[in-house]
Amino acid sequence: MGLNAKSVCSTSSTEPNGSIVTTAPSNGEVSSSIVVVVSSSSISSSSDSPIAILPHPDPIPSTSFSSASQRSEEELPGTSAASRTDEMCSCDSQNLAASTAATSNGNKRKRRLSSDSNEDPELGFEPPSAKRQQRLPALYGSEQGNLSSVASSVYTSPVVSVDGQSTQELLSIRSSPAEDLSEAPHSPLPDSPDSPPSPDRGSKQTPVVVRYAAEQVVTSTVVTQKTEDDDLLDDSCEDYSYDEDDEDDVEEEDDDVEIYSSTISPASSGCSQQQAVNGERTPGLPKHQEQIHHPVSDLMINMRTPMSPAVENGLRQCPLPALAWANAADVWRLMCHRDEQDSRLRSISMLEQHPGLQPRMRAILLDWLIEVCEVYKLHRETFYLAVDYLDRYLHVAHKVQKTHLQLIGITCLFVAAKVEEIYPPKIGEFAYVTDGACTERDILNHEKILLQALDWDISPITITGWLGVYMQLNVNNRTPASFSQIGRQKSAEADDAFIYPQFSGFEFVQTSQLLDLCTLDVGMANYSYSVLAAAAISHTFSREMALRCSGLDWQVIQPCARWMEPFFRVISQKAPYLQLNEQNEQVSNKFGLGLICPNIVTDDSHIIQTHTTTMDMYDEVLMAQDAAHAMRARIQASPATALRAPESLLTPPASSHKPDEYLGDEGDETGARSGISSTTTCCNTAASNKGGKSSSNNSVTSCSSRSNP
């Protein structure tokens, strides 16, 4: 048959079912082809694999062979086709055996990697990026001329088990350490498993490394060593120190970060050069875009933790009416939370860390600031903002000198005016009222220090803000029976007139006078602003109104109302008559604002700060506080002194209420006895002169009995 003059050339191809077909054609009239079929199911760790030799149905012309086959004819004359076929099969068997051993070894490592992972995949688990298969060019362990059409499309997740087809595809992939592989940009289009490799992507292209956030770095061509896996899975060797805010940020990132497919579209091919760094799921996205901080979420998380006894008793009942622009319950909850949070930034012991300052110095400074506000017609809100800034600054600062206290006070008023006023005074006006003690440059320099100490939080809800809300609720006649409608926001009718002031300005100023006097005392830092406003309403109006408008329990308001009682007595006796002429002209038109709120207060003179309190009034309050403190200490030392017996009941008086003649010392007993003896002598003399009168005898007897007990 002329087989001696013919050469045997074999080609191999991969079928869709995962089988490798090796064809050995021969040139001649009677040509025979040897097809080696290797089944994927027969691949195991053993070296003996079943090989089937099938005849090729169609002859292949000799012109299809390369010049290498012609050279092999000349070099090997006289070689039989059968022997060459056996040699070819043996070579292929050796290559397949070596590849099978490497593959089985890699499979064991992959299974070990899968078993070491913390989270086992459930049945039917499919990772997100498996929807679009990634192209992973292979590095062939054998000659590329023998296996040139093997294409691999292997998913790189460590938790996906390797099936038969992927095992067969892994035959052509050599096992190499991760350091030898370099990263390459992704292919813009996904490849089909059956499609041949394109000319521009040869076998020399390096595989793609895909990284996942907070997971192990896994590649299809690299089997990570056991020691490296243990280091990645075990975090006990590293120390992590997280804040509460950092933990919140990590939880938000885990929930909000989206898993993007590693296959890049043509539209985003310009970003394909950026590789995944630091475990980012999306290589093209910057790191700062993933780390998004949500202050609203932090606020809602912090609201779950109670911060004061008022919150521990339960949530405050919302007295607000239905609002068209927001949910009333949410608005009230945020207001209460902000008030509790701001109350922690102040303390009654704020002056203990300043040895050179006294509480009276703070009172003098605030009284001077009230006078400045009245001169420049600043709002009450401006003054109370300055008080808040001053107390918070003294709470965080250390060793403030008394010569700098006026500079701190005028700087607080300067910042508050810029926050609240529409037309704040110039900085030269603030420097002028200090009479040369502070310059403009000093105020500007200290403004930076003040804002840094306050952490740029300069918009709290002040006392006058809470007072306006409470009085507005009182005008709207909000009752506890109507509070339940807040839960049904859709069914409740929105009250658009609530945001416009409708209360009496005269009553507002009366209550503000009491709060102005209370502000001079450092004890106000013991209570939150909402509690202070509610306690003031309980004195000027009634306890029921304070409870209804504030939503607080009386157990929360009572300590503040008891502390405010001497201030109320002094302000009721010493306060001048309020010369406040309200010019509240009713809106005549029946459209626009007049239709929405017909009882609107058009005169805003009540919001201008007035100087109606003096230091003399504050001194009287201090004297009343000292007297009350002394009485309280006396009652605690001897509780019986507070008892008063009825007039009809004859009981001996208490020891503290006895006359002074019965409270003599032991040294005075001799004098008292000498006086008694002289009285007895006089009585005896008188009795002897009268000659036995019964009255004198009785007196003598009584005197002698008293002198000799």
UniProtKB/Swiss-Prot annotation:
Ranges annotated as biased composition (Pro residues): 187-199
GO BP of this protein: cell proliferation involved in compound eye morphogenesis; eggshell chorion gene amplification; G1/S transition of mitotic cell cycle; neuroblast fate determination; neuron fate specification; peripheral nervous system development; pole cell development; positive regulation of apoptotic process
Tagged with keyword Cell cycle: yes
Pfam families, A to Z: Cyclin_C, Cyclin_N
Region Disordered, residue ranges: 1-30, 43-149, 162-205, 221-289, 642-709
Signal peptide coordinates: none
SUPFAM superfamilies registered for this protein in UniProt: Cyclin-like
Keywords from the UniProt entry: Cell cycle, Cell division, Cyclin, Nucleus, Phosphoprotein
Phosphothreonine found at: T651
Gene3D superfamilies noted in UniProt: Cyclin-like
Function, in words: Essential for the control of the cell cycle at the G1/S (start) transition. Targeted by archipelago for degradation by the SFC ubiquitin ligase complex.
Protein name: G1/S-specific cyclin-E
Organism, scientific name: Drosophila melanogaster (Fruit fly)
Taxonomic lineage: Eukaryota, Metazoa, Ecdysozoa, Arthropoda, Hexapoda
